[in-house]
Amino acid sequence: MLTRIISGLVLLPLLFFVIINGGISIYLGALICSLIGLYEFFRVFEGSGYKPLKTTIYAMTVIMYTAMTYSGMSYSHIVISVTYLIFAVGAVYIMNRRIRVEDLMITIMGYIYIPVFLSHINLLSMDQTIYIWLVFIFAWGSDTCAYFTGMFFGKHKLIPEISPKKTIEGAIGGVVGTVLLTLVFARYFQEPNPIYFIPLAMIGSTVSQIGDLFASAIKREFGIKDYGNLIPGHGGILDRFDSILFTAPLTYYGITFITYIQNL
């Protein structure tokens, strides 16, 4: 626990610096986390004999983030173009029998699950930087509230076959705590309609917990405890960012919808 706390105290100032500084800091931070996350993700499958197109995905991830930041192309065009290139390269490998179809599917899954999902933080940084904080409130705020609620009040297991320690009471506490934290955020940044953020916070906490359980299900399926050991006390990048991968897209599209409603 002490190691976990120390790691958190080291990483939090770094996170604050990246978000507050914005621009190139967020671009590099998201890109580096995506590349490390991909490495951890593919390593799990390689241990069971799969052969994902790692080099191709690493290159395409760099291209995607760079195009997002500097090209002026629309996000959807970039993602579709990169996905097409991955399929094209994979098809050539399959025809030459260098990989199997399932290897390509794992490659595509890794690409969507990690760099595409996480890249929504970059999208937020372009014109809605303050809302990046919600990505982390929905993920880490929810996790913290769920942890302490479960510790003191947890009696009924949530999904014990995937995560034995999580409880229904903890999950509910995570949602309630996230709503309260989000209202504090809305008040601090003087949002004109904070009530709009309540359903977003509830969905955000729920999605965060689903992201955590999804990552846990993969680990349990392949018989591993952590995705890596890069962060002492926490595991790898994916162990720390499993919920972030799910809350980043939700936050972006949720804020886009709220902005649309407010402008009607």
Please name every model-derived segment:
Residues 12, 178-179, 240, 247, ...:
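Hydrophobic transmembrane alpha-helices of multi-pass small-molecule transporters
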Residues 181, 185, 250-255:
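Hydrophobic alpha-helical transmembrane segments that constitute the membrane-spanning cores
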Residues 253-264:
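Juxtamembrane boundary at the C-terminal end of a transmembrane helix
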